């Protein structure tokens, strides 16, 4: 089972403050573990334009039709001072890894320098921090009914309003998560 380019959808019973009602986009999953970005937990009072200001990046030439007031996500509890940018191709940046045909993760400054310009990738999600699972840990959490999984959907990843992503991700597999009981059992 490889969950790269899938969503982890927190079950209603998952009460961890960071992962409660979260949707995690899995960027890498192999025999050594998994790494992902939470895509529905906006950081308070932090937008893309604020990140650019802090890093002293001025988009030039600025394209005023591109919004920089999008929220920055809490990507996870690890390395919360590091930026991770999920975006659609191209992957021409210094530190990019292609996750799927339509999704790339970049950690280098050069992608930030394109934000607000015509060179910006068409879809962008900026996060600080990431989530990680050791070898076998994610598989055990799945067995423990902590998560549902669904193939990733770019509309949910980039376009669905943040507050609706948890419910919409569950709908991908035919589940209305708001009607699920708080605790699932084993059959």
Swiss-Prot record:
Protein name from the UniProt record: UPF0301 protein YqgE
Q: Where, if anywhere, are coiled coils annotated?
A: none
What highest taxon heads this organism's lineage? Bacteria
What's this protein's family per the entry?
Answer: Belongs to the UPF0301 (AlgH) family.
Name one cellular component (GO) term.
cytosol
**One Pfam assignment:** DUF179
Q: What InterPro entries does the record tag this protein with?
A: AlgH-like (IPR003774)
